[in-house]
Structure formats: structure tokens, C-alpha cells
Amino acid sequence: MRDALPDAPTPVYSGYPDGYERAKWHIKHGLEVFNEHFAAKPRGVWLSEGALSSAAVGLLDEFGFKWTASGEGVWRHSCEASHIDQHDLHSKKALYQPLQHSSQNCALFFRDDGLSDLIGFQYKDWHPQDAANNFVHNMENIANFLGDAVDEHVVTVILDGENAWEYYPDNASHFLTALYDKLSSHPRVEMTTFSDALDKGAKLRHLPVLKAGSWVYGSFSTWIGEADKNKAWDLLVEAKQCFDKVMATGELSAEKTLQATLQLAICEGSDWFWWFGDYNPSDSVRDFDRLYRRHLAKLYELLGEVPPPSLDIPLSQGGGQMENAGTMRRN
């Protein structure tokens, strides 16, 4: 937290018990679920809200991931700390090259916030053909700027997979059809995936310093650093301490141990903390607040413990009117 939010208020507890091991558990479990559905191992991963740190990338290396991605804020903070060439920084030329942090292997791709937010927030109000033409025009401008080295570069567009389309007419079917028609036949713009781009020789650039943060404002502020969010963390830490104490006794059956472990994983989900705060709509905050506290109470019950009275007290009220009902953040 301190690397991303050095001046923000902190929870009472200074860290999450065995956080690194819990992160490994979630990745391992995620890989098992992925393999169950697709009978394959993914080559890359998008961590929650593109949250990155040096430790997180090191963990991805342990699991053999070839790529991950984040937002332009993390890229900019990292480039500034790494003293990347000022022209490449301010012109965003360095944004269009995958980076490799220190001695780590995992390639890092960073989102073009401008292009991505056009799709996420602006084009919904445009005529589909005009929007598609504008996007392709922007891509052509980038290609012209990159010049002869264009083949070594990748323009990264990332947005929430489902949240944008409900704000378009007909779930964006007209816009997407027009866009893919233009891109698929364009002589200079090639659609690709991160894995294919790496296989085809996208040039990796060294990044000495990786600043921690996410694609939301380039920090971890969507999860921590405000009173409501910090209190939610303290409740989770106390539940984890209880979990560890009960597990150390070895008294739970194998079935109860599994149930409690899976319930803990639900409580550790990042989206709970996303919703807490006065900037989100009250109805949504109220629902997520109540559900979060209920899930924590269920964890205590599975452990054979009485839920603490603190779980009866609401954490957050909301009251804001975030764009797109708070499901996406504009950068």
C-alpha cells in the first residue's frame, strides 16, 4: 500500500496475515478452475483491476505466466521512477512497447487510457460508423508516429468485458460490427493478443522500477486508504486471525476445513472494497456492505465461532453518483 498511497490513512492492522500464501492459493485455485473449463493453462493473467507490484509480478513468474497488464497510471509512475527517456514518456512511445521489470520474466503491457476510455465512455453517444472511423483514425496516427519501428510495438486497449456495452444502443452490436469490419481489412493495423504479439517479436523494454498500483487512478485507492475501506480490512484481518487460530487446532473435519477455506476466499474478494466509499450509489453500497458482513459472519460460523458484534454495524453509506453506476472508472 505504501508504495502506491504513501500519505493515505491505513487500517489498524499493518498487514494481512499470510497474505503472500493466500495470493498463491487464489492463483492456484484460479488455474484449476480455468483448466477445468478449458483444459489448458492460460499464458497470461489480468489481476484484479490490473493491480501490479514487484512482488505480484514475482508471484506470476513463479506460476509461469508470460504476460500481465495494467493501466497507464502505473506505466507513467513506473517510467518516471525509472527515468525513462522524457520524449518516449511524454509522447507515450514507451507505452506501446511491452516492458520487463528488473530481472523478472513476465512481460508487462499497459493500457492506452485515451483509446480505451473512448470505447468505455464516449462512443456510446456516437453514430457507430463515426465511432469506428475515429478509432481507426487514432490507430493510424499512432502507426505514423511510430514510423519504421511500428512492427515492434503494440497498442493496448483494455476495458471491462461486459460493463460498457449496456450503455450502447443494441449492446454495441452496430459499433462492434463496424469496428471489426474496418480493423480486419485494414492494411496497417493488425489485431492481436498479448501472447501472439510476444510470439511475433514485440520488442521488450527494460523497466528498472515498477511502482505499485492499478488501472484505477494508478493507485490502490479503490480498495484501501479511506475510513470505510480500512474498517472493512480490519474486519477481514480479524476474521483471518480467527481462521488461523481454529485451523491450528486441527479440530475441524476435512469437509468443514474445505468449506471454511472457500468461504475465506469469498471474503477476500477485491470487489467488496471497491464498493465501499461515499462516491458510489447508496443502494449498491448498502447491498455490498450487507453481503460482505454476512459472508464474514458465515466464515465465523463455519469455524464454530460466534460472529463478533462489529459485523452488525454498517460500514459504508455511499451517496455518490459515479459514472456508469460505479461499475467502471474513467482515467
Report residues per predicted region.
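Catalytic domains of cell-wall/extracellular-matrix polysaccharide-remodeling enzymes
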Residues: 30-84, 150, 163-183
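Secondary-structure capping and boundary motifs in well-ordered enzyme cores
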Residues: 26, 48, 52, 256-257, ...
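CE4/NodB-like, metal-dependent polysaccharide N-deacetylase domain
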Residues: 20-47, 140-158
